[in-house]
């Protein structure tokens, strides 16, 4: 019997085209009614996770969620406040080191900080920057190496030419930092997320499991991206989404959903293997 169902957001329970599928909403609701804890595990921040938690009726549950690829564990408490268990951050020396590498590889960088109202960027303007600024709703400041940070950096999102990004990724990984990439906008470009040393969703999921006194084999995890790999491996049952574009993710998983995120793949899987119930007739399942 599963005691935790952990879910990635983007490309797993949420798609850009269709949002959160109603079948997935219903399945998670029914799982909660059976006493199963629903844990969000995402690369998003507290504020952007809140939007999806609200759609899934997971606000104010006091259940710990995993944010920033495992760089943060927090909960939306019953009193409406946010309780933070931990937040991993970069030292000032590491921040300067990474910005120098970003400059060498002609990349654009957008950086989240401990303060949900502040972000940092490097010099220059791009469509990527404006998109991130709009999404994050933060006051964005330009990083200057000789000026003290107003809030410590917790995650970098970098964007540039694919070959430059690949070389940059190798450099930051050689220094021990966690890096996750996925194709973004065009085939010639790539988006890379950089987290502090040792940070990944598996680390976050292990922390949550210990807090809730739940064994790995009692955890069901759903994900589609490279940043889901360690959580897929840690969970007793790690499930990759049918729509995942990464073979490494599908090979690491114990199972693969029959449907995509657009089709309600998480919901269909939960109905079949967790609830063991027929899917309501109002849902037309097309495989």
Swiss-Prot record:
Q: Does the keyword Magnesium apply?
A: yes
Keywords recorded for this protein, A-Z: Hydrolase, Magnesium, Metal-binding
Active-site positions on this chain:
8
One of the entry's Gene Ontology molecular-function terms is: magnesium ion binding
Cellular component (GO) terms are: cytosol
Tell me any Pfam family this protein matches: Hydrolase_3
Q: Which residues bind phosphate?
A: 9, 42-43, 201, 227
Name the Enzyme Commission number(s) assigned to this protein. 3.1.3.-
Residues recorded as binding Mg(2+), renumbered to this chain, are: 8, 10, 224
Say which family it is in. Belongs to the HAD-like hydrolase superfamily. Cof family.
PANTHER family reported in the protein's UniProt record? HAD SUPERFAMILY HYDROLASE-LIKE, TYPE 3 (PTHR10000:SF8), PHOSPHOSERINE PHOSPHATASE (PTHR10000)
What is the protein name stated in its UniProt record? Putative phosphatase MCAP_0732
């Amino acid at each position: 019997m599963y005691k935790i169902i952990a879910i990635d957001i983007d490309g797993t329970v949420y798609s850009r085209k269709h949002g959160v599928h109603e079948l997935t909403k219903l399945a998670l609701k029914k799982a909660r009614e059976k006493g199963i804890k629903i844990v969000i595990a995402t690369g998003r921040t507290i504020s952007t996770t809140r939007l999806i938690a609200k759609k899934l009726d997971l606000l104010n549950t006091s259940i710990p969620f995993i944010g920033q690829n495992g760089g943060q564990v927090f909960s939306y408490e019953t009193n409406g406040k946010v309780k933070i268990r931990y937040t991993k951050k970069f030292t000032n020396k590491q921040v300067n080191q990474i910005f120098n590498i970003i400059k060498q590889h002609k990349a654009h960088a957008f950086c989240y900080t401990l303060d949900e109202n502040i972000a940092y960027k490097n010099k220059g303007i791009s469509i990527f920057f404006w998109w991130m600024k709009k999404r994050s709703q933060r006051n964005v400041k330009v990083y200057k190496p000789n000026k003290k940070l107003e809030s410590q950096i917790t995650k970098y999102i970098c964007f540039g030419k694919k070959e430059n990004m690949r070389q940059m990724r190798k450099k930051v990984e050689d220094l021990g930092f966690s890096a996750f990439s996925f194709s973004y906008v065009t085939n010639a470009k790539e988006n890379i997320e950089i987290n502090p040393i040792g940070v990944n969703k598996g680390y976050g999921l292990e922390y949550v499991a210990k807090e809730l006194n739940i064994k790995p084999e009692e955890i069901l995890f759903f994900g589609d991206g490279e940043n889901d790999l360690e959580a897929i491996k840690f969970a007793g049952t790690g499930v990759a989404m049918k729509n995942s574009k990464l073979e490494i993710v599908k090979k690491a998983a114990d199972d693969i959903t029959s449907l995509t995120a657009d089709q309600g793949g998480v919901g269909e899987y939960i109905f079949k293997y967790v609830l063991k119930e027929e899917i309501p007739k109002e849902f037309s399942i097309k495989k």
